[in-house]
Curated annotation (Swiss-Prot):
Gene3D superfamilies: F1F0 ATP synthase subunit C
Topology of this chain in the membrane: Multi-pass membrane protein
Database matches in NCBIfam families: PRK07558.1
Pfam family, one: ATP-synt_C
Location in the cell: Cell inner membrane
Positions in coiled-coil regions: none
Name this protein carries in UniProt: ATP synthase subunit c
Oligomeric form and interacting partners: F-type ATPases have 2 components, F(1) - the catalytic core - and F(0) - the membrane proton channel. F(1) has five subunits: alpha(3), beta(3), gamma(1), delta(1), epsilon(1). F(0) has three main subunits: a(1), b(2) and c(10-14). The alpha and beta chains form an alternating ring which encloses part of the gamma chain. F(1) is attached to F(0) by a central stalk formed by the gamma and epsilon chains, while a peripheral stalk is formed by the delta and b chains.
């Protein structure tokens, strides 16, 4: 295998990181909706924590995207 084919295999593996971020964000918000349905009085605190968690999970996907772009254009 040459270096170009290995580069594109690495880019494909970066897609797994973006897929994991999407699964993490969907899991966070499905749990948020379940928790708010059980205890509506805690909705404000739960929303704040869920948004922080979603931002961190989405950051991992963005890091994977940036690394994939660096691999493509390097």
């Amino acid at each position: 295998m040459d270096i170009v084919s290995l580069k594109f295999i690495g880019i494909g593996f970066m897609a797994i990181g973006m897929y994991g971020a999407a699964l993490g964000v969907s899991n966070i918000f499905s749990s948020l909706l379940s928790a708010i349905a059980r205890n509506p009085s805690a909705a404000e605190n739960l929303q704040r924590m869920a948004l922080i968690g979603a931002g961190l999970a989405e950051a991992m996907g963005l890091f994977a995207f940036v690394i994939a772009m660096l691999l493509i254009f390097s």
